[in-house]
UniProtKB/Swiss-Prot annotation:
The gene is ITM2B. The keyword rRNA-binding does not apply. Residues 1-54 are cytoplasmic. The keyword Chaperone does not apply. This is Integral membrane protein 2B. SMART domains: BRICHOS. It comes from Sus scrofa.
Length: 266
């Protein structure tokens, strides 16, 4: 039988080695702290770079907000802007030469024809928008017309040719928006039954307009993406030659107490 014994002196010596000295302190580092403080240098973003990125983001958001505001204002004016009044009405006129005096009692009854059109009045902006549909019987062309009193311009859009024509506003023919509005209200109420005459104006096409931005919002809206030309008034000649008339667009419309036949010739 073998008896196993331990040397007590050796055990005490090993225990003394494991104990810290009286003048020393034990430093204990938590494992989590070591994991947080020890980062990969590639993952550390410099302070200046972070600040520059923040400024770029702020400027980008500011530009986006400005674009949304400006775009919203433009879309509101383009789509949501409604005219003060919209009217669909007509006027009767004599197709023959203008008769200002009373006809004799035995004279035959005058041959009246009718023009019907849509009229939108933007009174605050000083603009009249006239839409002439395809006539049923008259030999005239459909068109959209803008009279801009602020820009002092008139624009015709020939719907058959899809071309625009611009000319200075003729205030002797076109009523101002407020006066035209009163006339239309009276026609609608039946207090004024228009039976009028037809006057003629003859225009010729001159130069092409490459940039229409300066023509105002309403004319730009009418003529955007269309070939646009300048017009020049020509002295009306009684009995226009057929060859000349064949090269003309004929637009019959009214924005006064009388009807107007506009010839636009190349």
């Amino acid at each position: 039988m073998v008896k196993v014994t331990f040397n007590s002196a050796l055990a005490q010596k090993e225990a003394k080695k494991x104990e810290p000295k009286s003048g020393e302190e034990a430093l204990i580092i938590p494992p989590d702290t070591x994991a947080v403080d020890c980062k990969d240098p590639d993952e550390v973003v410099p302070v200046g770079q972070r600040r520059a990125w923040c400024w770029c983001m702020c400027f980008g958001l500011a530009f986006m907000l400005a674009g949304v505001i400006l775009g919203g204002a433009y879309l509101y004016k383009y789509f949501a802007l409604q005219p003060d009044d919209v009217y669909y009405c007509g006027i009767k006129y004599i197709k023959d030469d203008v008769i200002l005096n009373e006809p004799p009692a035995n004279a035959p009854a005058a041959r009246y024809q009718t023009i019907e059109e849509n009229i939108k009045i933007f009174e605050e902006d000083g603009v009249e928008f006239i839409s002439v549909p395809v006539p049923e019987f008259a030999d005239s062309d459909p068109a959209n017309i803008v009279h801009d009193f602020n820009k002092k311009l008139t624009a015709y859009l020939d719907l058959n040719l899809d071309k625009c024509y611009v000319i200075p506003l003729n205030t002797s023919i076109v009523m101002p928006p407020r006066n035209l509005l009163e006339l239309l209200i009276n026609i609608k109420a039946g207090t004024y039954l228009p039976q009028s005459y037809l006057i003629h104006e003859h225009m010729v096409i001159t130069d092409r307009i490459e940039n229409i931005d300066h023509l105002g919002f309403y004319i730009y809206r009418l003529c955007h993406d269309k070939e646009t030309y300048k017009l020049q008034r020509k002295e009306t000649v009684k009995g226009i030659q057929k060859r000349e008339a064949s090269n003309c667009a004929t637009i019959r419309h009214f924005e006064n107490k009388f009807a107007v036949e506009t010839l636009i010739c190349s």
